[in-house]
From Swiss-Prot:
Subunit comment: The complex is composed of two ATP-binding proteins (BtuD), two transmembrane proteins (BtuC) and a solute-binding protein (BtuF).
Name this protein carries in UniProt: Cobalamin import system permease protein BtuC
Biological source species: Halobacterium salinarum (strain ATCC 700922 / JCM 11081 / NRC-1) (Halobacterium halobium)
Gene Ontology molecular functions: transmembrane transporter activity
Keyword Cell cycle: no
Chief place where the protein resides: membrane
Length: 369
């Protein structure tokens, strides 16, 4: 137990250092280059290194196409924040434009990676990812409907995507459940069927979207463009709380790897644990895709690669996957921002992830031979 805890701390610390380094370097890159020192001071000023602080819970109206929907968020009121004398232009660029996008990217990447790690263990299949239970396709239907039919779906893009993701995930679960038992194979096949159906609905909406096809396609490809602090305030609490719950069930996930019968023998309530893991992973993924769109490969490639390095122990795998996923998505978005056309980050993750994943598969096959 102590050895596993020590490994988790060591690997998490290393991944945390990597994440911070990627965040800082990413903030220096853009049309207006800014030095690393200025970025660090601007970040400290924006995040306000405080003498004191108070935290309050409130509801925030998420920006929508039409109408509005209250969304729980946290407000941190700082007392006497320290100032670092950063030029006003640099402070605006870093604090208002780059940092919200970078922090949201890290949040989304972490949520997709930790959900992917959980679902790969859940299905005992390294090819599983958050989209396998219909979360991404459900979010796509909700978001595209809100974009193309704002007079019908009046709650807006992010709330519609979040609701669509959860409805799809729990529909998959309801279809696969019989007499209180949910076979993993049935759940997997139900997810594929629902995902295919929702993909057809999304395609129909896009084909008939007219002038709204561009924003719909951008959302479907995944983008962090235009991210602001209120997006971070809405997404971060959901991801943090959900990730904490998943980490608390790391031991049960380790036991489930041995098989459901062995897990029963060792005192794990298998059906209850599976329901909880699926629900929380779906909520965490929904919070991510509702703000960033359908970004692929993060939840597939990151936990798979991390597992090859740190092993299958979820006490180590989950935190390291989350931190590495955040770093990976921020790095991919930095590449997107550095190009002249600034493509959606989902294109970059696919270009990076697909060849790397094929390499991993080929490498494993060669070793097996």
């Amino acid at each position: 137990m102590r050895e596993a805890s020590a490994r988790a701390v060591a690997w998490s610390a290393a991944a945390g250092v990597l994440l911070v380094a990627v965040l800082l370097v990413s903030a220096t890159i853009g049309p207006e280059p800014i030095t690393l020192r200025t970025v660090a001071m601007a970040a400290l000023t924006e995040l306000a290194v405080p003498v004191g602080a108070s935290v309050t819970m409130h509801t925030h109206a998420v920006p929508v196409v039409s109408g509005g929907l209250p969304w729980p968020a946290l407000t941190i009121a700082y007392a006497a924040p320290l100032q670092f004398g950063v030029p006003e232009t640099a402070q605006v660029i870093v604090g208002t434009i780059r940092l919200p996008r970078i922090v949201l990217g890290a949040t989304v990447g972490a949520s997709l990676a930790i959900s992917g790690a959980v679902l790969q263990g859940f299905f005992r299949n390294p090819m599983a990812d958050p989209s396998i239970v219909g979360v991404s396709s459900g979010a796509a239907v909700g978001a595209v409907a809100a974009i193309t039919l704002p007079s019908v779906v009046v709650i807006g893009v992010q709330p519609a995507a979040f609701a669509g993701a959860l409805i799809a995930a729990f529909t998959v679960y309801a279809i696969a459940t019989k007499n209180g038992h949910t076979p993993t194979a049935t759940l997997l096949l139900s997810g594929v069927a629902v995902q295919t159906l929702l993909g057809a609905v999304t395609s129909f909406l896009v084909v008939n979207s007219g002038r709204e096809i561009r924003p719909a396609m951008y959302w479907l490809m995944g983008t962090l463009h235009g991210s602001r602090w209120h997006d971070v305030e809405a997404a971060l609490p959901v991801v943090v709380v959900g990730s904490a719950v998943l980490l608390a069930y790391a031991r049960e996930m380790n036991v489930l790897l041995a098989g459901e019968e062995d897990a029963h023998t060792l005192g794990v309530d298998v059906d209850r644990t599976k329901r909880l893991l699926l629900a929380v992973a779906s909520v965490v993924t929904a919070a991510a895709v509702s703000f960033a769109g359908a970004i692929g490969f993060v939840g597939l490639i990151v936990p798979h690669a991390v597992r090859l390095v740190v092993g299958p122990d979820h006490r180590v795998l989950l935190p390291v996957s989350a931190l590495t996923g955040g770093a990976f998505l921020v790095a991919a978005d930095t590449v997107a921002r550095a190009t002249a056309t600034e493509p959606p980050v989902g294109i970059i993750t696919a270009l990076i992830g697909a060849p790397f994943f094929l390499y991993l598969l080929r490498d494993r096959e060669v070793r097996a031979l």
